[in-house]
Amino acid sequence: MVIFSTLTLTEADHAAIADALSTLESKLSALISVSADQRRSLNKMGEKSETFCRRTLVAMSENPGLIPADVDVAEAQRDMAQFDALRPHIARLTKLLGRAEDSEMALGSDAMV
């Protein structure tokens, strides 16, 4: 069964893609890598905890006198702002990566026919 007939990328296309990836790597150089152990130990923000976190940040900013001095509300707000800003980029990259992997699989499958 042929799923994918052709994908034609020129040398110029490959060069432009490599340049674009280099730009992304440069602009996203502050992204971190975590080990499997670190990943397991991190708190994960799911849908319910995200709502709770957002509401808590609002409550903390509205009631600064109730917050312990060692809690940096401004830093938490900056983290949430960066979380929000990064999310749409991750969604686009994830979708693009999925399409690239599907195309790679289809090309390999077609080549085996």
Roles of regions detected by a PLM:
Residues 1-113:
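Basic/polar low-complexity intrinsically disordered segments
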